[in-house]
């Protein structure tokens, strides 16, 4: 007869009316009993012939993709002018005095952050925007381009202008100026000798400093005159209008420009498309503009050749239209859905490209991308705004993968010890936290995103048109991309983006200037940054608590008024460092703080309500007697594992599930096992904070017997049959807890000390977890353990009791600030349980 749930509870000693523990508990360590129970609950039967179930409620296999939903009305979030102050260390020192070694080290890591992967794989521009929404290809293309443009305007991206230069917006950092070692000198030569125009001091070539001579030429039509190659070569020796551009030997490569991406990437849908190339890769140093009076710099890539008057068409003859978008203007409409109807809507479509406020030199950057991008909802609760997902997973794959640095995350007990107190709490929201941290420009060539332009994107995705070779282009080929779908999409998008449609239809390559999400280095750097800032805040306000996990920053103070003044001071400090906070998202929690998925109050920690609801839902949908795919089990264990510390039996209860995942076998829930788990998770107990104290109770064991020292009392007992030493030590600890009720026990066994009972026989692990819940252990060396003699059967010998002080740990949660204890503002008779009374020591 299968084991009933009631019987199983009794077996695990979870009911009150269990027999004496010294008899019942050792039985649970018996292998035979564990095996019989596993068979009864159908836990051991891993090989099943029935087909597996691949979906339980919302849980599907780990690698099945949930199809994201496209929203044509997504808003692109705005990014305020985020600029982390470069002298952040000095500012912190003014605020709090000299920084500790740890704070210094962490802040240096991100000023600037560096990223040097072993191998970088470059992908063609077509892979720049992922075709994630096949139904909304054009819409997604423009929304993504607009998002990237917004990021570039906000100073978060560099725009690749040529192989060795990039432009950006926003305030420059010193390391962005250091790149130009030599002086960049523009020279235009006149007949009466050279006159150097705009000598540049080392540093950034800024828009304003380029001087009117160049700026005026930049303002002229981007589609400037196209020289005839033959004439140009013929005039090359002529001295009269010759121009020299002198650049000190430096990483600019050849002066002037190559047409971007001469390789197959760029057979874009345009003729020798000066302006198309120009947008993907701006000519070096604003094409090192050096032209004789009155001629626009064509920007068309020829090795810094200049065009004397008679060799090139003059401006009045009209520019040569080599821009895919503008070519439609002069063409005959091919149908009522021809794109020329849209292009003829307005006269001035604006420039083909935009350029940043500053130009810097970069290491060699190919006209390629290293990761694809696409848009998704900002979060499950906010579907009106979009979020850019960047896929740089190439750096985490294969044998060239980068091993990202590890960093400490506080475990549940450390977090509770630290934050469980009767403080008032408030949490701050750092807006676009990742985009605060600057990257060194040398990392730019490894983190490239972009797109190959609308013409090519549409050509690649529409079945009837082929990607046309630039050389043999006819007007008919131009119309290959016209279709009703494209026409309707563009008409709708015209209402949103207006003349920006033209700008966005050009190719572009952008590199990250701030750390992107989607690279394993970013979470590490963000954690280092926020923990250093919180450490500074804690030292500045020693009677308060500031703590962070990634971009989640919480502040605690003893009263609400105190908290508000702390909030004002900290906000002012963070803003002075250039950290942008989102005041609308500041949450005041009162005395129970919501943080990292937990609710933390003076009573301890529990999971947040939405997680509890998810668990209830999971059990409602969980099928019985049907094999469930192990990948789905991974999902279930992920959810249940989060709340396991709050249940009676903890992680050991999930061991059968872990075993099936390891064996990559399906798991079948028997009615009893499901009922057992369900009841475990319906009643959650808070995890309380550990208190410091003096250890009075000691336990020890040998394979054959156990001994306890409770105050001055000694006890001993023997096991029916010899047990493995770890099992014996665990039993002794359980006896000590049940006999004395003490929450602090001394033991010399490291496994018991670790409080991980998953490696013990299954039934014993479950029972011991419940008996020892909320117990703290202190390590006592065997030689000094007062329970050592009783465990060996010697009751007559008394070793003196040790004065063993127990200090709860806050783990490696970077509380490097030693905080002085604060006199309580409450009356003395009220015990103020706060981590603030305990001076923090570095771990």
From Swiss-Prot:
The keyword Lipid metabolism does not apply. One of its GO terms (molecular function) is metal ion binding. Pfam families: DNA_pol_viral_C (PF00336), DNA_pol_viral_N (PF00242), RVT_1 (PF00078). GO terms for biological process: DNA replication; symbiont-mediated suppression of host innate immune response. The keyword Magnesium applies. Keywords: DNA replication, DNA-binding, DNA-directed DNA polymerase, Endonuclease, Host-virus interaction, Hydrolase, Inhibition of host innate immune response by virus, Inhibition of host RLR pathway by virus, Magnesium, Metal-binding, Multifunctional enzyme, Nuclease, Nucleotidyltransferase, RNA-directed DNA polymerase, Transferase, Viral immunoevasion. Residues 347-690 are annotated as: Polymerase/reverse transcriptase domain (RT). Residues 220-265 are annotated as: Disordered. Belongs to the hepadnaviridae P protein family. Hepadnaviral virions contain probably just one P protein molecule per particle. This is Protein P.
């Amino acid at each position: 007869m299968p084991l009933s749930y009631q019987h199983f509870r009794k077996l695990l000693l979870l009911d009150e009316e269990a027999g004496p523990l010294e008899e019942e508990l050792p039985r649970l360590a018996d292998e035979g009993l564990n095996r019989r129970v596993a068979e009864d609950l159908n836990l051991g039967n891993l090989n099943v012939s029935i087909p597996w179930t691949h979906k339980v409620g919302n849980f599907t296999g780990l690698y099945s993709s949930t199809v994201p939903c496209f929203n044509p009305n997504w808003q692109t979030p705005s990014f305020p002018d985020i600029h982390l102050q470069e002298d952040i260390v000095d500012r912190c020192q003014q605020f709090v005095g000299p920084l500790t070694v740890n704070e210094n080290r962490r802040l240096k890591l991100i000023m600037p952050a560096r990223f040097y992967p072993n191998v970088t794989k470059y992908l063609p521009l077509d892979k720049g925007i992922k075709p994630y929404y096949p139904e909304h290809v054009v819409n997604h293309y423009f929304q993504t381009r607009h998002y990237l443009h917004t990021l570039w305007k906000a100073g978060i991206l560099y725009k690749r202008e040529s192989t060795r230069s990039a432009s950006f917006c926003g305030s420059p950092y010193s390391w962005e100026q250091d790149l130009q070692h030599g002086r960049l000198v523009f020279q235009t030569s006149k007949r009466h000798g050279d006159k150097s125009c705009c000598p540049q001091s080392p540093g950034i070539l800024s828009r304003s400093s380029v001087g009117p001579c160049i700026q005026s030429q930049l303002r002229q039509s981007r589609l400037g005159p196209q020289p005839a190659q033959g004439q140009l070569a013929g005039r090359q020796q002529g001295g009269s209008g010759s121009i020299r551009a002198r650049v000190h030997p430096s990483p600019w490569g050849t002066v002037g420009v190559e047409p971007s991406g001469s390789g197959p990437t760029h057979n874009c849908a345009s003729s020798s498309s000066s302006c198309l190339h120009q947008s993907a890769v701006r000519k070096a140093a604003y094409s090192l503009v050096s032209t004789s009076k009155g001629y626009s710099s064509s920007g068309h890539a020829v090795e810094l050749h200049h065009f004397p008057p008679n060799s090139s068409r003059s401006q009045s003859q009209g520019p040569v239209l080599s821009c895919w978008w503008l070519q439609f203007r002069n063409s005959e409409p091919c149908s009522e859905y021809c794109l020329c109807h849209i292009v003829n809507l307005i006269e001035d479509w604006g420039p083909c490209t935009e350029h940043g406020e500053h130009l810097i030199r970069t290491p060699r950057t190919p006209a390629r991308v290293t990761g694809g991008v696409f848009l998704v909802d900002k979060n499950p609760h906010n579907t009106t705004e979009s979020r850019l997902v960047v896929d740089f997973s190439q750096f985490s794959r294969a044998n060239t993968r980068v091993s990202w640095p590890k960093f400490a995350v506080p475990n549940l007990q450390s977090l509770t010890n630290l934050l469980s107190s009767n403080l008032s709490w408030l949490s701050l929201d750092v807006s676009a936290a990742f985009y605060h941290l600057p990257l060194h420009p040398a990392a730019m060539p490894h983190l490239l995103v972009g797109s190959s332009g609308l013409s090519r994107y549409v050509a690649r995705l529409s079945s009837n048109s082929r990607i046309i070779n630039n050389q043999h282009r006819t007007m008919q080929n131009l119309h290959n991309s016209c279709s009703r779908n494209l026409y309707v999409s563009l008409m709708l998008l015209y209402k949103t983006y207006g003349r920006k449609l033209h700008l966005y239809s050009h190719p572009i390559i952008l590199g990250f200037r701030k750390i992107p999400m989607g690279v394993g280095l970013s979470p590490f750097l963000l954690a280092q940054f926020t923990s250093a800032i919180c450490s500074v805040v804690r030292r500045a306000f020693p009677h308060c608590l500031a703590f962070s996990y990634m971009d989640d920053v919480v502040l605690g103070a003893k009263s609400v008024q105190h908290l508000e003044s702390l909030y004002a001071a900290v906000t002012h400090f963070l803003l002075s460092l250039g950290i942008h906070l989102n005041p609308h998202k500041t949450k005041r929690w009162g005395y129970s703080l919501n943080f990292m998925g937990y609710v933390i109050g003076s009573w301890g920690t529990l999971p947040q309500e939405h997680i509890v609801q998810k668990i209830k839902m999971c059990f409602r949908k969980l099928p019985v007697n049907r094999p469930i795919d192990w990948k789905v089990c991974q999902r279930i264990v992920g959810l249940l594992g989060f709340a396991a510390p709050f249940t009676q039996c903890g992680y050991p209860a999930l061991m059968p599930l872990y075993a099936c995942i390891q064996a990559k076998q399906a798991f079948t829930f028997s009615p009893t096992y499901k009922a057992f788990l369900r009841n475990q998770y319906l009643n959650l107990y808070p995890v309380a904070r550990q208190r410091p104290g003096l250890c009075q109770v000691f336990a020890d064991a040998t394979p054959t017997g156990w001994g306890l020292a409770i105050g001055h009392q000694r006890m001993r007992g023997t096991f029916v049959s010899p047990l493995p030493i770890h099992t014996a030590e665990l039993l002794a600890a359980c006896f000590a807890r049940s006999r004395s009720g003490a929450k602090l026990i001394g033991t010399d066994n490291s496994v018991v000390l670790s409080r991980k009972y998953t490696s013990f026989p299954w039934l014993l692990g479950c029972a011991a977890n419940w008996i020892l819940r909320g117990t703290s252990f202190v390590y006592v060396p065997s030689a000094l353990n007062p329970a050592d003699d009783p465990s060996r059967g010697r009751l007559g010998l008394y070793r003196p009791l040790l004065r063993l002080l127990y200090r709860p740990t806050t783990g490696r949660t970077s509380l490097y600030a030693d905080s002085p204890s604060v006199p309580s503002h409450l009356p003395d008779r009220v015990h103020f349980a706060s981590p603030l009374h305990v001076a923090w020591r570095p771990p």
